Every structure is written in structure tokens, then in C-alpha cells.
Swiss-Prot record:
It catalyses: Endonucleolytic cleavage to 5'-phosphomonoester. This is Ribonuclease HII. Residues 15-193 form the RNase H type-2 domain. Its cofactor is Mn(2+); Mg(2+). A divalent metal cation binds at residues 21-22, 112. HAMAP family: RNase_HII_B (MF_00052_B). Keywords: Cytoplasm, Endonuclease, Hydrolase, Manganese, Metal-binding, Nuclease. It is an enzyme of class 3 (hydrolase). GO terms for molecular function: manganese ion binding; RNA binding; RNA-DNA hybrid ribonuclease activity. Belongs to the RNase HII family. Endonuclease that specifically degrades the RNA of RNA-DNA hybrids. It comes from the Bacteria.
Amino acid sequence: MEVDLLHFEKKYHNYIVAGIDEAGRGPLAGPVVASAVIIDNTNIIPGIKDSKKLSKKKRELLYEQITSNYVWAAAIISHIEIDEINILEATKKACSIAAANLSLKPEIVLVDGNMPFKDKRFVSMINGDNLSLSIAAASIVAKVTRDRLMLDLSTEFPQYLWHKNSGYGTKEHIEAINMHGLSPYHRRSFKCC
């Protein structure tokens, strides 16, 4: 059965609805990125779905379309702050900042996951990137934004292969850590090797 990705946007049709998702909760290196997107219900971009279900090429194409046609914002929390406040709090902070940075003030904020927020506008949705078009669009913007950041960092530290693994704990990444030690961009609070 096909899921109506606009179900929640339609449910809250009298409100300005933003979707939020993050990228980078699980990697061993780099920041966590959250993105907020307010879609235009009169201009639905075809092909938007959870970023994990898209090829890199398709994500890049949709990223350009989303950021050109919809209201959006992103927030980046560094690996240093992740180590200071923990990944959950860093993710929540990134989500809150992304929502606050939107040029339109959202009245309802649909967030992928099950994180509790003090702000009553925030509605957490488990598997939200498969249930809401706004969240799916945000997942694409967050993923592409973070992947581009990690690609930039990989030019400084090519031995960790971040251009391929985006900082995640792949076999090759862990082998590189064991051989070269941690880079300045590795999260110290994440135990991996």
C-alpha cells in the first residue's frame, strides 16, 4: 500500500508546517546536521522520499530542487559540541536551530524520530521520513549538506575515506583510525576501536 506523504501536511493544512530531519547521529567523525523544510503544497516536487532510499545522484538533484523551491534552513552542531553535550542533545539543538532559522515561522514542526521537545509545536514521528513529505525533503537537505561537509574535510584528511563513508564506522574507516589515530574531527565520546 502506497503511503500518502502529504497526509500530515493535509491534516495541518491551516498551519505553516515544517518538517525536520537530521543526518550524522551515528558517525565517528564530523558534525550532526539538521534541516527544516516547509513545502509548497501547490508545487510538489516529484521523487521526494527518505534520503536513504535515493541514489547519491538523485539526492543531489532533489537537493537543488528543494532548496530552490521551498523555504528551508539547516543547522550544524560540531563534533566538539556533540562530545560536550551528547549526541541526543546536539541533535535536538540542531533541530531547534533549523526551525528557528526558517524565514517563515512554522506553527507545526514534524520531526523524524522519537525525541521529546519542550516546544509544543514540535511533533516527533517515528519513521517520519517515510510518512511526511516535509520530513523526507528535510532528510535530503540534511544528508546532502552533511555529505558535502565531509567531502570537504576528506581533502584535509584523505586517509579516513570520508568522501566515501561520511565519517561512519566502516571497516576501512576503523582501520584508518587504528593506523593513523583520531583526527581533530573525530568524536571523542564515541568509542569505536
